[in-house]
UniProtKB/Swiss-Prot annotation:
Keyword Secreted applies: yes
Annotated signal peptide: none
Lineage: Eukaryota, Metazoa, Chordata, Craniata, Vertebrata
UniProt-listed InterPro entries: IL-1_fam, IL1/FGF
One GO term (biological process): positive regulation of cytokine production
Residue numbers covered by the propeptide annotation in the UniProt entry: 1-12
Organism, scientific name: Mus musculus
PTM summary: N-terminal truncation leads to a dramatic enhancement of its activity (>1000-fold). Proteolytically cleaved by cathepsin CTSG.
Protein name: Interleukin-36 gamma
Purpose: Functions as an agonist of NF-kappa B activation through the orphan IL-1-receptor-related protein 2/IL1RL2. Part of the IL-36 signaling system that is thought to be present in epithelial barriers and to take part in local inflammatory response; similar to the IL-1 system with which it shares the coreceptor IL1RAP. Seems to be involved in skin inflammatory response by acting on keratinocytes, dendritic cells and indirectly on T-cells to drive tissue infiltration, cell maturation and cell proliferation.
Chief location of this protein within or outside the cell: cytoplasm
């Protein structure tokens, strides 16, 4: 079942994203390379991207019981993950966008939202815009992507280590 919401939205009276790192079950972390997020083995010589996370301000307008709807971004450079159909396939992309602008938008920005589900110590991130498609990783050095092949060939389970 779903855990309680692991993210804070108010620190010192103002909305503030949480920050952390993501790594898959093969101990591969996310890094920013060539305008994409790719996975590489975790080591002391690798600096993972800092992910930024904010829950959707209006979750009541989205499907219930699918997890916590979140915006997922990175720092340095400030970009957000979003899903778009490219050549007939749901595709995971990065876009220069401020996570707080998405949060304050008067309605949910579905292409930028993911249902976060935590089971035990691992998390999955399902696209709100493309239900049944999850953020996934595969081989070292390859970009993260969307897949509908849940648990078949690709890793859709991640460890989310919140630092704030």
């Amino acid at each position: 079942m779903f855990s309680k919401h692991p993210f804070s939205t108010h620190i010192s009276g103002r909305e503030t994203p949480d920050f952390g790192e993501v790594f898959d079950l093969d101990q591969q972390v996310w890094i920013f390379r060539n305008q994409a997020l790719v996975t590489v083995p975790r080591s002391h010589r690798v600096t993972p991207v800092s992910v930024t996370i904010l829950p959707c301000k209006y979750p009541e307008s989205l499907e219930q019981d699918k997890g916590i709807a979140i915006y997922l971004g990175i720092q340095n450079p400030d970009k957000c993950l979003f899903c778009k159909e490219v050549n007939g396939h749901p595709t995971l992309l990065l876009k220069e966008e401020k996570i707080l602008d998405l949060y304050h938008h008067p309605e949910p920005m579905k292409p930028f939202l993911f249902y976060h589900t935590r089971t035990g110590g691992t998390s999955t991130f399902e696209s709100v815009a493309f239900p049944g498609h999850y953020i996934a990783s595969s081989k070292t050095g390859n970009p993260i992507f969307l897949t509908s092949k849940k648990g078949e060939y690709y890793n859709i389970n991640f460890n989310l280590d919140i630092k704030s």
